[in-house]
Amino acid sequence: MDLNNRLTEDETLEQAYDIFLELAGDNLDPADILLFNLQFEERGGAELFDPAEDWQEHVDFDINPDFFAEVVIGLADSDGEEINDIFARVLLCREKDHKLCHILWKE
């Protein structure tokens, strides 16, 4: 993989959010979708992190933080606070030539 051919942080967030919106209808309860849509403007967000350790339990490849990012999408108690109602955790490859993502959905 090429360090010079990675998505920027903003591109990573945007791509993860687009994937979330595309797949949410098939993976979240209708009540959660309604809540997310009603509250996202005021309390919603997407935050970028290095991949958490527990991803190794869900995928069978090496998660190099230089090439993978975790995007947490959900709602916070109020604007500016950390997301505490997580609707999806998206593991995304940041290398532009390797389209790979894995999502852990709210249960």
Swiss-Prot record:
Domain of life per record: Bacteria
Pfam families according to UniProt: DUF440
Membrane-crossing segments per the record: none
InterPro entries xref list: dsDNA_mimic_put, Put_dsDNA_mimic_sf
Family as reported in the entry's similarity comment: Belongs to the putative dsDNA mimic protein family.
Cited function: May act as a double-stranded DNA (dsDNA) mimic. Probably regulates the activity of a dsDNA-binding protein.
Classification via NCBIfam families: PRK05094.1
Name used for this protein in its record: Putative double-stranded DNA mimic protein YPO2187/y2032/YP_1985
Organism: Yersinia pestis
